[in-house]
Regions:
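Gly/Ser-rich catalytic serine loop of serine hydrolases
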Residues: 1-2, 88-91, 215
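Active-site SXXK
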Residues: 1-22, 44, 99-103, 146, ...
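Active-site catalytic microenvironments for nucleophilic, acid-base chemistry
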Residues: 9-14, 59, 64, 102, ...
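Conserved catalytic neighborhood of penicillin-recognizing serine enzymes
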Residues: 16-65, 81, 109, 121-152
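Mid-domain, small-residue-enriched loop/turn segments at the edges of structured enzyme/sensor domains
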Residues: 33-35, 61-100, 107, 111-114
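A penicillin-recognizing enzyme superfamily signal
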Residues: 46, 92-93, 97-98, 102-256, ...
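Long, low-complexity, intrinsically disordered segments
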Residues: 288-316
Length: 316
């Protein structure tokens, strides 16, 4: 689930768009060579391709990525290594949720408020807590670009299963499986509500032995069930806004037309999901010969790719 932060920096700092191509090809990590898929940025995020995240980390840089994560509300320890792009850091769910608030909130990050008010048994207000102060961390157009990219995850990628639930609103999000396959995540949102689900063991040393039990297969359906129940409950104030609002500056951009975006989000190398490919969500693996941080740093320096051309007004 950390990958969207890296992709955000590709948009804001390097000028990437959903149709920017990220190359695939052989990638050697920890003495093991895998065949990585390439494709458009929309395709790579939808499929959660590790090789693409690796290339983006080489472009953006580790320290800039950590700096941005801090701006988004992530206070957890982030090791200064490229492996954070592949799920190597332990980040609490609430911190990840706060970092995602900028996407549906048009670029504004909002700290969580755990209690909004206290009432007595008769419903009399005893105390009302102040509303969190939001701060802008990215522009509205960049936030909407990321919303579209993360809608691709739900429409064409690893979180397609949430579409089987009756949620009468547009959906976007990201699956995740942490390093060592100990946690399965899904963080998703509609225009009105952001929520996250986690599957794992209290003891982080106990892995989920099947990669089919990670974010895509276990966490995403739980999110879908929760959200469908929320929207079905007429006592709750959700369902008034069902579509993400497109900024005026992007309305004439052909990239965001539905059919065009569908074509962009499904444009990849289409490798078979074999053991030597990177169809493993955020998972780095836990086999003998895994990647070390020193090796990651060395490979990162060798695998840098050129930033995309800076965005011009005509791009938006």
């Amino acid at each position: 689930t950390f990958k969207p932060l890296l992709y955000t920096l590709a948009v804001t700092d390097a000028g990437y768009t959903p149709e920017t191509n990220i190359p695939g090809g052989p990638l050697t990590l920890g003495g093991k060579t895998i065949s990585t898929e390439g494709g458009t940025m929309a395709y790579c995020l939808a499929k959660s391709l590790n090789g693409a995240a690796w290339h983006l980390m080489g472009t953006i840089g580790v320290h800039r990525t950590i700096e941005f994560a801090r701006q988004c509300g992530i206070a957890a320890k982030l090791p200064p290594y490229p492996s954070i792009a592949l799920g190597a850091a332990e980040i609490p769910m609430l911190q990840m949720l706060q970092s995602y608030t900028m996407f549906p909130n048009k670029g504004f990050n909002t700290p969580p408020v755990y209690f909004t008010r206290i009432e007595d048994k008769d419903g009399n207000l005893l105390y009302e807590f102040p509303i969190s102060q939001s701060k802008e961390v990215i522009g509205e157009a960049d936030a909407y670009t990321m919303v579209k990219l993360m809608q691709g995850v739900v429409q064409f990628g690893t979180a397609r299963r949430v579409n089987s639930y009756n949620i009468p609103a547009e959906k976007a999000g990201k699956t995740g499986t942490t390093n060592g396959n100990t946690d399965g995540w899904f963080i998703g949102y509609t225009p009105e509500l952001l929520a996250g689900t986690w599957v794992g063991c209290e003891d982080p040393f106990i892995p989920i032995y099947s990669s089919n039990s990670g974010g895509a297969e276990m966490s995403a359906p739980k999110w879908g069930l929760f959200m469908s129940n929320v929207y079905a409950d007429k006592r709750l104030p959700y369902g008034k806004v069902t579509s993400f609002e497109q900024p005026a500056e992007l309305k004439n951009n052909p990239i965001f037309a539905e059919q065009n975006f569908a074509n962009i989000a499904t444009s990849g190398d289409s490798l078979d999901a074999e053991e030597n490919t990177d169809h493993r969500d955020d998972l780095m693996g836990n086999e003998e010969g895994d990647v070390t941080d020193d090796k990651l740093l060395k490979d990162s320096a060798a695998k840098k790719i050129k930033p995309a051309p800076k965005k011009k007004e005509s791009d938006y």
